Swiss-Prot record:
The keyword Cell cycle applies. Belongs to the ZapD family. Gene3D superfamilies: YacF-like (1.10.3900.10), YacF-like domains (2.60.440.10). It is found in: Cytoplasm. It comes from the Bacteria. Cell division factor that enhances FtsZ-ring assembly. Directly interacts with FtsZ and promotes bundling of FtsZ protofilaments, with a reduction in FtsZ GTPase activity. InterPro entries: ZapD, ZapD_C, ZapD_sf. GO terms for cellular component: cell division site; cytoplasm. This is Cell division protein ZapD. Pfam families: ZapD. Interacts with FtsZ. GO terms for biological process: division septum assembly; FtsZ-dependent cytokinesis.
Amino acid sequence: MICYELPLNERIRMLLRLEDLFDKIDFFSARDTSFEHHAALVALFEILDVTSRSDLKSDLLQELDKQRTMLEGLQDNPGVSEKALIHILQDIRAAFRGLLDIPGRIGGHLRDDEWLMSVKQRMSIPGGACEFDLPAYHYWLNMAPDARRADLQNWITPLTSIRSGINIILNILRNSGTKFCYIAAKGVFQQAGSEHQAHLLCLHISDEISCIPEISANKYALNIRFIPWRSDHKTEVCEEDVPFELTFCSL
């Protein structure tokens, strides 16, 4: 099965983007080549750009506090695992404290590093990080992999609380969902928007079906069209009926 996630507001969209970027840093920084560590640094700079355009810290604190209050209200509920509840509450409180401890703007330690910012500025130019443009960066890329990895870890570590908060919120969101099985007749599915309210849609489709979903949703309607994955025509729709699973997730 292939999962397609569609965020239905800008806040969730940003959290998903940041989750993806943090995962890329993990993947590339764990490897040894200079190309992979360059890719990790590119992802780190993208995190800096995404977080600079929002009050992410305040949003995370507000949502974590909301979830903590809701979960604390379930402590005497016999239908809820006490062990699991204690664990998630501990994670929320730890992430909350970590966010409060972040001084100033998110990524301030990166913005204060003149060398890093000079590299970031050149990277914004297509092909701008060549050795003749950035000899000091070329030197860094030729350092031992463990030395580069240690630098990457030092730059990423101050963002740990941000990542923890994002992971907690997205985990709660995804696990809140109600799953339904549908069939898109001749590749088209429509539903009144009032039937299910959600902040995130998770659509699962068999990887044997060579179609991709094109989803549009608002408070009035949900429309899904399954189109051939390499279609040259935007109006082309899969001709067969397409079974799929759809999960409506809300905070």
